[in-house]
Amino acid sequence: YILKSIYKNMTQNCSCGKHCITTKENMAGKIAELNPCENCEDVAIKKFSPLNELIDFNELDSDYKKCKCGKRPIDIVMSHVLKIMIEEEIIPQNATLRRHSPVPLPCFYYSTQMAQFIGKDSLVLIHPDFNKKVAKRLTDEVDEVKGVLKGNPQEVNGMIDKDSHIKNFELLSGCCNRSDVMRTLIKNNDEMEKIIINKDQHKYHIEVAPTTGEKLIKLHNYLENSNIKKGTAIDGMCGNGSIGIYLLKYGFEKVIFNDVY
């Protein structure tokens, strides 16, 4: 009942006014969008070489190396991002993709690998030295960037304990709503159930979806091997609640979601 109520009240419209929210109905279309078209051509950029020695910055705009389907190789997109960061002097002139890139978070995640060709509004970027001027340029000039966050991805968001202050990333520009889709081993009508987590990333610590997926597989195997089919469970320090949602789908009658934040 709880899960049905959540899905019933969920709309496909994000607070930004766009269709950022992933639902059971639009998930298949978003998964299909991850695939490149037959004309997408991969371009690999040397990660440890200064970017300004590899690409003419005068040519590097939103149309540079863009396929007719509207997608570009991820290396080209990140090169475009790095160019703007260099021009705004928040990283050195000899910056490289490996050492100076912000963390790119896919707005829609489904699989163990990041899509190599991405289209409009596909990324949320995070870097500790971003400012509003840089952020505006990134969302205005790089089509693939949907949102820009200021913060250290190595730090934990929210509250570490009950006495600590709430810590969030700062949303500087755009929208930071993201969706993670995780596969499970729960079978329903000949299909494996999937768990969809939609979140405004500035409020949450960065959690790697494959790691969460591995946790769900280990939990499933433990429950199956222990012949546990139902019961009451506590998802302590639940964060986004992936494990608790999984237990409800698995058949548990009651799950307590608990987190200090």
Labelled PLM ranges:
Residues 128-209:
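Non-catalytic substrate-recognition/targeting regions of SAM-dependent transferases
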Residues 119-124, 145-149, 231-234, 254-258:
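Hydrophobic beta-strand segments of well-ordered beta-sheets in folded domains
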Residues 217-261:
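Conserved SAM/SAH cofactor-binding pocket of Class I
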Residues 190-194, 198-202, 216-219, 225, ...:
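A short mid-domain helix/strand-loop element embedded in enzyme catalytic domains
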Residues 80, 133-134, 218:
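Exposed alpha-helical structural elements
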Residues 114-120, 140-143, 224-230:
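Flexible, charged surface loops at secondary-structure boundaries
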Residues 211-215:
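N-terminal pre-P-loop "Q-motif" helix
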Residues 1-118, 124-127, 163-170, 247, ...:
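Non-catalytic accessory regions of SAM-dependent methyltransferases
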